[in-house]
């Protein structure tokens, strides 16, 4: 696709990543959520592309040091949604029902609410997962509201979870653009251009959440969740969670700081959770 705007020309290249191709195994077994961005990041660093667009919940904890997030677009709703053709909510599912999900976070949280429920691997895009649900391979699934909205399928939502019921993934609902750190005038111009569409409020929240993730050194094997909110008087509140894979334990920490200290707040929350949960859970 080619887009012309203000005398600039962009060539948009669609790329299928390794994460899109390996669908028969959990992400934690094949390299983690970074599989959705590694191929694109390599192309960025090599200079084959000038910017990479990511769902921030799929972005690795630590970026390639030659790159940065140039902007965060206005964030969508961060909640998760329960989808079923037979039950109105998670609590209404019959005993021993099967829920399809590929997320260790969702598995832990589901088990916390419904220890009797069985979870099975559920990979693929939104349409693929919903087709599996409609084919009765599972009784229900859980997906991000933001993802459903982007493909026009919010009508499939049976129950929207509150942030406390099923806390979201770090960065959920946010789209970010990764750029090279400038080493030449062209890179500097690209970063400057992209930064002009940065949504300040969304960027502050994502920065705080990812700082928490960094303090925990969280990977796809660790059930970690969290959400942040800007409040009056230039404040930000962050709440983070570490969940045991079997759902028997949930550790949480929350606090408020100035928006200027958003990253510091995230680091502090992460360090507190690390002490609470211990290295047996955070790995």
Predicted regions and their residues:
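Pocket-lining segment of extracytoplasmic ligand-binding domains
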Residues: 119-208
């Amino acid at each position: 696709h080619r887009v012309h705007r203000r005398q600039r020309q962009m060539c948009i290249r669609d790329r299928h990543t390794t994460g899109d191709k390996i669908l028969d195994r959990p992400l934690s077994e094949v390299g983690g959520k970074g599989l959705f961005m590694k191929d694109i990041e390599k192309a960025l660093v090599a200079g084959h592309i000038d910017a990479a667009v990511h769902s921030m919940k799929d972005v690795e904890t630590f970026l390639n040091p030659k790159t940065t997030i140039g902007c965060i677009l206005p964030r969508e709703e961060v909640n998760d949604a329960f989808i079923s053709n037979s039950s109105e909510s998670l609590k209404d599912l019959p005993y021993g029902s099967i829920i399809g999900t590929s997320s260790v976070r969702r598995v832990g949280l589901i088990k916390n609410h419904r220890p009797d429920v069985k979870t099975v691997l559920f990979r693929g895009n939104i349409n693929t997962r919903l087709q599996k649900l409609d084919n009765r391979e599972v009784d229900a699934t859980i997906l991000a509201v933001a993802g459903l909205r982007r493909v026009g399928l919010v009508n499939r939502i049976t129950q929207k979870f509150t942030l406390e019921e099923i806390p979201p993934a770090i960065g959920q609902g946010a789209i970010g653009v990764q750029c090279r750190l400038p080493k030449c005038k062209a890179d500097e111009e690209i970063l400057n251009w992209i930064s002009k569409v940065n949504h300040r409020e969304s960027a502050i929240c994502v920065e705080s959440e990812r700082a928490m993730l960094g303090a925990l050194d969280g990977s796809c094997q660790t059930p970690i969740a969290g959400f942040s909110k800007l409040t009056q008087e230039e404040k930000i509140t962050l709440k983070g969670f570490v969940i045991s894979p079997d759902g028997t334990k949930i550790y949480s920490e929350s606090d408020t700081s100035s928006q200027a200290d958003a990253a510091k707040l995230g680091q502090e929350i992460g360090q507190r959770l690390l002490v609470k949960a211990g290295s047996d859970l955070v790995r």
